[in-house]
């Protein structure tokens, strides 16, 4: 693992490849996950996923291989794990994940499973040896699912690739995206990663188009499906803001002949009037929605997409800086400065050192850093981990409903700053 990936996985908002692949596997109902590795890796991945996917922990197991297994192999540990699940679990399918160290041993997972004559299919995956991030693990796992698919008769539907329940409000985002597409008469065949069944995911080759919303999670799988099933794909990112959502739908409609945007556009215009009404009421009392500085620190789609919506539709600022948690070729004129975590760390540290107030949209890692530095700020969480706020409602960050929610959150952040200043 490169030093930058290690830092991102263990000290910032990213996690490891084992967690990424487990996040996809655990999202499929009836699927169990065995972590072939130490308890540390197991507990870390299980807890991280279960926090956003209640009940996932009940379908996790760990082989706990000892030091001898690193030399002689983990066959005994795996067989013990299989026997445990025979007695205590009821999997429809089992995914076995080798952690970094066990990946170096080279055990034939599926061969060991075949000798055990198990009543359910077993799929094995290495989590990258000593190299890999959450996105890399998720991408590798999605490609593994594509390998299990068979050609099917084509329909007019689409697949949405690159969503995960493990992302902040990820399941709610998926529900909103499905709602928007169906509002435009676009049938969704499958959305892996957010609770779709195995049967639904295996129907993905029926689709006439793959919509990739996060390149780092799903571009490789889309390329695989283009090669195997001749399904074209478009990379469109995530829809943020009202106008941003309409542009997003227009891009998809250009590729789907049966799409009709009339109902979606009508809803957007209606909701825009509502936002304008509430926004004008607030401006008359508190002034314009302005921040001297705005800082984003999140994955690429969240950072760039929300930044474009924020500056184009909701608020303004003297300077908007983005710290991307992964590199990307995507760009937006809404951003003044772009830095990449693990590449521009010296400049990122300088940004925090010079910070003297404004809005930060990030995870709790960044807000805690500013607190430790005794820097003034107001905040809005747009990515995990989040330690000082609970997310229970089904409100998304993206789409029409997400635009309303984010506008509300950003206004409330501004108001909380006014209240704190009044108290001091």
Regions found by a protein language model. Give the residues of each.
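An N-terminal assembly and electron-transfer interface module characteristic of large anaerobic redox
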Residues: 1-424
């Amino acid at each position: 693992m490169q030093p930058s990936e290690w830092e991102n996985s263990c000290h910032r908002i990213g996690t490891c490849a084992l967690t990424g692949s487990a996040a996809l596997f655990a999202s499929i109902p009836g699927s169990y996950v065995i972590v072939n590795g130490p308890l540390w890796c197991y507990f870390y991945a299980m807890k991280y996923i279960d926090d956003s996917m209640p009940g996932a922990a009940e379908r996790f197991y760990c082989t706990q291989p000892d030091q001898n297994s690193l030399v002689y192999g983990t066959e005994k540990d795996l067989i013990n794990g299989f026997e445990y699940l025979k007695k205590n679990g009821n999997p429809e399918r089992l995914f076995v994940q080798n952690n970094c160290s066990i990946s170096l041993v080279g055990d034939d997972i599926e061969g060991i499973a075949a000798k055990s004559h198990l009543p359910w299919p077993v799929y094995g995956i290495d989590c990258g040896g000593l190299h890999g991030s959450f996105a890399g693990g998720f991408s590798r796992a999605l490609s593994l699912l594509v390998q299990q698919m068979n050609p099917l008769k084509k329909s007019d539907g689409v697949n949405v690739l690159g969503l995960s329940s493990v992302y902040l409000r990820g399941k709610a985002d998926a529900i909103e995206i499905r709602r928007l597409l169906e509002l435009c008469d676009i049938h969704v065949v499958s959305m892996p990663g957010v609770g779709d069944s195995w049967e639904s995911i295996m129907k993905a080759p029926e689709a006439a188009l793959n919509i990739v919303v996060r390149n780092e999670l799903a571009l490789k799988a889309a390329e695989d499906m283009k090669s195997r099933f001749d399904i074209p794909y478009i990379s469109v990112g995530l829809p943020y803001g009202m106008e941003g959502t309409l542009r997003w739908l227009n891009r998809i409609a250009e590729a789907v002949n049966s799409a009709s945007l009339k109902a979606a556009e009508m809803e957007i215009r209606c909701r825009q009037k509502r936002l304008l009404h509430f926004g004008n009421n607030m401006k008359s009392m508190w002034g314009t929605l302005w921040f001297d500085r705005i800082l984003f620190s999140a994955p690429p789609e969240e950072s760039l997409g929300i930044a474009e919506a924020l500056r184009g539709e909701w608020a303004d600022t003297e300077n908007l800086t983005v710290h991307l948690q992964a590199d990307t070729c995507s760009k937006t004129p809404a951003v003044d400065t772009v830095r990449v975590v693990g590449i521009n760390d010296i400049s990122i540290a300088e940004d925090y050192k010079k910070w003297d107030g404004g809005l930060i949209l990030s995870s709790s890692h960044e807000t805690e850093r500013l607190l430790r530095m005794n820097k003034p700020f107001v905040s809005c969480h747009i990515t995990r981990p989040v330690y000082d706020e609970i997310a229970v409602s089904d409100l998304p960050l993206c789409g029409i409903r997400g635009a309303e929610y984010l506008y509300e959150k950003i206004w409330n952040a501004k108001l909380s700053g006014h209240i704190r200043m009044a108290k001091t």
